């Protein structure tokens, strides 16, 4: 008797990428499989059944793939948060810390209206830096984050704790220990 595959079964692990000692969790294999992708989107939507969500915000880059599909299923708009200099028009920006240095993400200054309920999505929650920056951008525009949804949580890197300390509801479809 065969068991039903879980989301985790569709995710490929690549050893020593991008650096030695890293186990890279590759979601492109999940995205490439129609059944796996459908399972992931359906499971990411499940916690929000009946909840008001006005827009989905996706973090660059794989959050765009998930966010677009989820927004379509919810019949709501999609808003990208991108690296600095990638969005045309007027934006606001937020810096955040990386392992070595800092980065900046941006959102259009008219993308979120005050009081809108937002679902923030990305493929991976590691340290929480990018997601925290995205949350700050949405809140600066007056939006309210309903929840943050991810495919993968890397709990050893502490991102969930960072987001929960900001008062966020966090959902992930699976977790992998280690780096």
From Swiss-Prot:
Taxonomic lineage of the native organism: Bacteria, Pseudomonadati, Pseudomonadota, Alphaproteobacteria, Rhodobacterales
Keywords in alphabetical order: Cytoplasm, Glycosyltransferase, Purine salvage, Transferase
UniProt keyword Transferase, yes or no: yes
NCBIfam families registered for this protein in UniProt: apt (TIGR01090), PRK02304.1-3 (NF002634), PRK02304.1-5 (NF002636)
Protein's name according to its UniProt entry: Adenine phosphoribosyltransferase
Quaternary structure (record): Homodimer.
HAMAP family reported in the protein's UniProt record: Aden_phosphoribosyltr (MF_00004)
An annotated GO cellular component: cytoplasm
Organism: Ruegeria pomeroyi (strain ATCC 700808 / DSM 15171 / DSS-3) (Silicibacter pomeroyi)
């Amino acid at each position: 008797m065969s068991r039903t595959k879980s989301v985790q079964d569709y995710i490929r692990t690549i050893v020593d990428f991008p650096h030695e000692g890293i186990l890279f969790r590759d979601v492109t294999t999940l995205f490439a499989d129609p059944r796996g992708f459908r399972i992931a989107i359906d499971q990411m939507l499940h916690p929000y059944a009946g909840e008001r969500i006005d827009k989905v915000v996706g973090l660059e880059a794989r959050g765009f793939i998930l966010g677009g599909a989820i927004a379509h299923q919810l019949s709501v708009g999609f808003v990208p948060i991108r690296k600095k200099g990638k969005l045309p028009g007027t934006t606001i920006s937020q810096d955040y810390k990386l392992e070595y240095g800092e980065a900046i993400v941006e959102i259009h200054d008219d993308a979120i209206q005050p009081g809108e309920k937002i679902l923030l999505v990305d493929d991976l929650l590691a340290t929480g830096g990018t997601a925290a920056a995205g949350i700050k951008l949405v809140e600066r525009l007056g939006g309210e984050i309903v929840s943050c949804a991810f495919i993968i949580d890397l709990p050893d890197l502490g991102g969930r704790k960072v987001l929960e300390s900001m008062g966020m509801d966090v959902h992930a479809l699976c977790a992998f220990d280690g780096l």
